[in-house]
Amino acid sequence: MLNVLVLGSSGMLGHVFSDYFKNKFQLHGTLKNSLKTYRNLSSTKINYFDNFDVLEENLSEKIIDDCNPHFIVNCIGITKQIADQSNKEAINFINGEYPKIIEKLCKQKKTKLIQLSTDCVFSGKKGNYTEEDICDADDIYGVSKIKGEIKDSDSCLTLRKSTIGLEIKDKHGLIEWFLDQKEIDGYKNAIFSGLTSYELARVIEKIMIDFPQLHGLYNVSSNPINKYDLLRNLSLLLRREIKINPFEDFFCDRSLNSSRFIEKTGYNPPSWERMLMELSKKILERDETKK
């Protein structure tokens, strides 16, 4: 059985990965705070290291030594939504330098890092970005994530992607924001080619099992959709009365071209209908537990 360490098991990606992987792999995870503060976090079949501080010297190495994992999936990061409120040095360290520290440890200990990058390394001026396109983001978040991309190590696979999904604690992402609204502008010229967090978990599972030697930088994406259609289709599935006004006076196309990844792995991205159906079921299931 594969032995996997998820760094950052309470975030939007980390908590989904942990819940999905726990029945498939020997699983370990790090938590920023005490385990008892996460009421909705799965606590069975996972060996947690709580109160984890990335700034504490040698702690990451100690945890890796304790786990001896085959794979480390790095979900630790300061997100775009809170980057402007965060310390510049902290953003650059956590998003830019910490992945390199983990990669060096992986090389020493003969394990493999899966580093998660973002479509936000691009400005969004043109879309259909390939791995060869020059990263042209100029905001603090985008620049920090550019620094964290590892392209030339046998010990690291960097996946450039974008994701949507539910959160369990800090709710800053698109979906949690959307669910709290009554009326919004839906951007018809904001193009998105991401995956749900649940689909990305399946992608990473496939890599670890079928393509463990894959390394370097790869884009992973779905078929592009504009955010108006994305949110409108989700609201219809949920039968939520959220008024979505079509808004065209904003353009941003960070869509990724994942032809290289598809050719290498045979991956077939699911339709948005399928991904949103799964996401809507997760939302409705969570709503039921709150009653």
Range-by-range predicted roles:
Residues N51-I94:
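NAD(P)H-binding glycine-rich loop region in Rossmannoid oxidoreductase-like domains
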Residues L2, W272-K291:
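Amphipathic terminal alpha-helices
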Residues L2-K24:
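N-terminal Rossmann NAD(P)H-binding glycine-rich loop of SDR-like oxidoreductase domains
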Residues G29-R39, D53-V54, G77:
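N-terminal Rossmann-fold cofactor-binding loop
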Residues F93-K100, C120-L159, I164-L166:
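Catalytic helix-loop patch of NAD(P)-dependent Rossmann-fold dehydrogenases
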Residues L7, T30, C75-I76, L113-D119, ...:
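SDR active-site strand-loop-helix element
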Residues D138, I150-E199, K206:
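NAD(P)-dependent short-chain dehydrogenase/reductase
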Residues V203-K206, D210-S258, D287-E288:
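Mid/C-terminal beta-alpha module of Rossmann-like enzyme folds, strongest
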